[in-house]
Regions:
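Positively charged n-region of N-terminal signal peptides that target proteins for export
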Residues: 1-4
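Bacterial N-terminal signal peptides
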Residues: 6-15
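Bacterial signal peptide processing site
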Residues: 19-20
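Long, charge-dense tracts
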Residues: 26-52, 61-65
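A short, ordered amphipathic alpha-helix with a cationic face
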Residues: 26-27, 47, 80, 110-114, ...
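Short, flexible helical or helix-coil boundary motifs
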Residues: 44, 77-80, 84
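Short coil/linker segments at helix-helix boundaries
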Residues: 54-67, 71-75, 87-132, 139-259, ...
Length: 263
């Protein structure tokens, strides 16, 4: 099986023994992004580490910028039928995420920057123009989730004021329906699913969190982003414990053979 770039999880390469050249094929990476990626790939693994071979290099692909970029999205929305083209672009990324293992998690890369100030503006613009688009609703929901995180901060709940929590909650009341409706229309849109897990952890909404976790695990069990949520859920700050962290690590370890980036 031929490996294609860009590659994030590199499931195909590790499972079928792709060559070093395939791992480092950057032909699909924009020229402006190649230097930083090459520098990361050239960094040797730490001595004495226990990661699977090349797992560290595989993670370099996580550092790539959002694609399509926020600038590309904003430009397309101003073009005739640009909203339709943008939806098709995201539909293609979604399809490749599940049907071409070498492109797994590029779907998450397509939602990488919507929590930035510019990303929030672009997501609002996209949603305002095509509120019926599941991809636009997921972007808008993710952007608002970013606002909720900013309002709350990252301290323990005991160190977070009621005003911060109230501000967070008001944002999440907007984000949840957007993300849920996006997932209803596109059941495999795992970035929206992961956001719902995040929200469930934030407000200790066990039914929401468990339902989203079950859905994510069923549709996208090898995704780095989905599996990282197991660790977030186990974090003592969100009601977990160190024992739960150990359990989550063991659960993820069972999937490492299929997706070494999870190591």
């Amino acid at each position: 099986m031929k490996c294609l770039a860009p590659i994030l999880l590199l499931t195909t390469c590790f499972a079928s023994g792709c060559t070093r050249d395939a791992l480092e094929d950057m032909s699909a990476v924009p020229a402006a992004d190649r230097a930083a990626l090459q520098a990361c790939m050239a960094t040797p693994d730490l001595a004495g580490n226990h990661w699977p071979e090349r797992a560290g290099k595989a993670r370099c692909w996580l550092s790539l910028p959002q694609n399509p970029s926020l600038q590309d999205i904003s430009r397309m929305l101003k073009e005739p039928q640009g909203d339709l083209k943008l939806d098709r672009r995201y539909a293609e990324i979604l399809s490749a995420h599940f049907n071409d293992p070498a492109h797994r998690d590029l779907l998450f890369l397509a939602y990488k920057d919507f929590r930035t100030e510019e990303g929030q503006r672009v997501a609002a613009e996209w949603f305002a123009k095509v509120p019926g688009s599941a991809f636009a609703r997921a972007a808008r929901g993710d952007a608002i989730l970013g606002m909720a995180w900013k309002a709350r901060g990252h301290a323990f709940a005991s160190q977070t004021s009621d005003a911060q929590l109230d501000s967070m909650t008001s944002q999440l009341k907007i984000a949840v329906p957007l993300l849920e409706s996006a997932l209803r229309d596109e059941p495999k849109l795992s970035p929206a699913c992961v956001d719902l897990i995040d929200i469930g952890n934030l407000v200790d909404a066990t039914p929401l969190r468990d339902s989203a976790m079950q859905h994510c695990s069923a549709i996208d069990p090898l995704s780095w982003h989905v599996n990282s949520m197991y660790l977030t859920e186990a974090d003592p700050r969100w009601g977990g414990s160190f024992d739960k962290i150990d359990q989550a690590v063991e659960q993820i370890r069972l999937r490492v053979k299929e997706s070494p980036m999870l190591a």
